[in-house]
């Protein structure tokens, strides 16, 4: 989180590896919804079916402790703020499966539920509210 690179365009999003070069990018904001709708309708006509949900297993406490140690190290080295540390700790909790034991099967929905819980918790903090407001008004991340 503290070192995250934020994309400022669809092309840059592809360059950062978040999208495939074959993914569609519509730079015109006013055309995005219509273009997305047309892509979806085309996929339906071509017989698209969603892939099967992946099989996932919780990573558990040991990897989470490693993530938390790295997060603490970044804060101590001055690369992350207290709030960055709070967010990153919540992310570590999510991606390791919460309180589940290592190897326990976990679904995408379980991970989404953990993410929703963490996001709602963070939205109750003044610093998260400041970050959201700053991003909405400037388009740039706030490091507070």
Where are these regions (language model features)?
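Intrinsically disordered, low-complexity segments enriched in small/flexible residues
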Residues: 3-5, 9, 15, 21-144
